[in-house]
Amino acid sequence: MNSKRSKEEILFKTVKENNILPITSICKLNCIFCSHKNNPSEIETYSFGHLEFDLIKKMIEFLDPEQPVFIGESASKIIEGEPFVHPDIYKILNYIRQRWPEIEIKITSSGSFLQPEKVDLLKKLEPLELNISLNGPAPEERVFLMNDTRPDNVFKLIPELKKQRIKFDSSIVSMHHLKGCNYLKRTFDFLEKYPPQSLRVFFAGFSGFADEDLIIEKSEYYKLNNFIKQQQKYYSFPIIIEPQLISSLEAEINNLITNSAAQAAGLKSGDIISKINQIDVKSRVDAFYKIKAAKNPEIEFIRKNKKLKTRMLKEENKDSGLIMSYDLTLNQINKLTAYAEASKKDKNTAVIASIPAYKFIKKMLKPYLNQDFNLTILKSNNLFFGGSI
């Protein structure tokens, strides 16, 4: 995997399949919760340092301009670093905007290396959104949790983002089992002064190779979830725990972005979307993207067992402001049900599900769990990672 050809194949595949644009694997932080640490030796990952501008230009040609481009998002086998430590970051962003004038740019950043005085350059590149990995309420927590060498910067950056009206979301990897829940509340309090579109609080996941002091008990998930539910009413921005535990494919709304099309349409947290433009929805993912793709969609939904209807005023391929858990795409649903259907003819078809997903998969495939089908759902312990990441 060290040849130039192999490197380019890996990069181009990531760009083409996920619309992720890797530009660097260099981070300059050393977060105690980093998902790139403590991997089992069998895990295949790639780290490329700063990629050359000419190579990045070629990769940009493979982007789908109808979908957002993600920069700094660790969602593939490539180790993603901090975009704003790349020496050509503004050159890269300007080239993306020149090549694809309408593409939405989404950048995940620690906020440590994006200088507040450079924010006006980002404003000129809109549509652009940032996801700021805040992780703590003050510089001292950033030093402890992230080994941040510039811990003050993000607390100067966020007020500047609000001043320039640049859209941003924020995130926290919760280490409440080490720091207590009060540090989370203090982080929420800071953000309330400069509200993000949403705040995601990630339940930390560690492999069995991590230090024992870091590994978190499963019961802490419910403690964190209850804490967030209790605190939400005090804040103007949605606070969402990740991962979400879901039990069905019902297209339930988790929350809404303030002043969004979804909020203006009268939708609320807990509503279950059933139809969009009179077409049934099959999952949360299906509903979310059908609404995003449509102009002024008519939405049928269920609220406290009552069937209701509304129209959302928005343009095609524009965000609705809905916040929903990610479940299954139509393609995944069709593939899984096709295997279940085939078990009528084939011998002993098995679907292996993790413990958290077992009830969800069992409910989804319930029509096939009878004597007419040779289908079994197996519940499997996660012995490989031992965590949520």
Task: Name these PLM-found stretches.
Residues 7-51:
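Canonical Radical SAM [4Fe-4S] cluster-binding loop centered on the CxxxCxxC motif
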Residues 38-53, 63-86, 96-114, 126-155, ...:
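Core AdoMet radical
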Residues 66-72, 152-211, 224-241:
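Conserved C-terminal portion of the radical SAM core fold
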Residues 86-97, 125-131, 180-198, 253-262:
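Short, electropositive alpha-helical surface patch
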Residues 110, 352-358:
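Structural motif
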Residues 230-233, 246-247, 288-329:
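PDZ-domain C-terminal substructure recognizer with occasional recognition of PDZ-binding tails
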Residues 239-269:
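PDZ/PDZ-like groove recognition
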Residues 262-284:
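Conserved PDZ fold ligand-binding element
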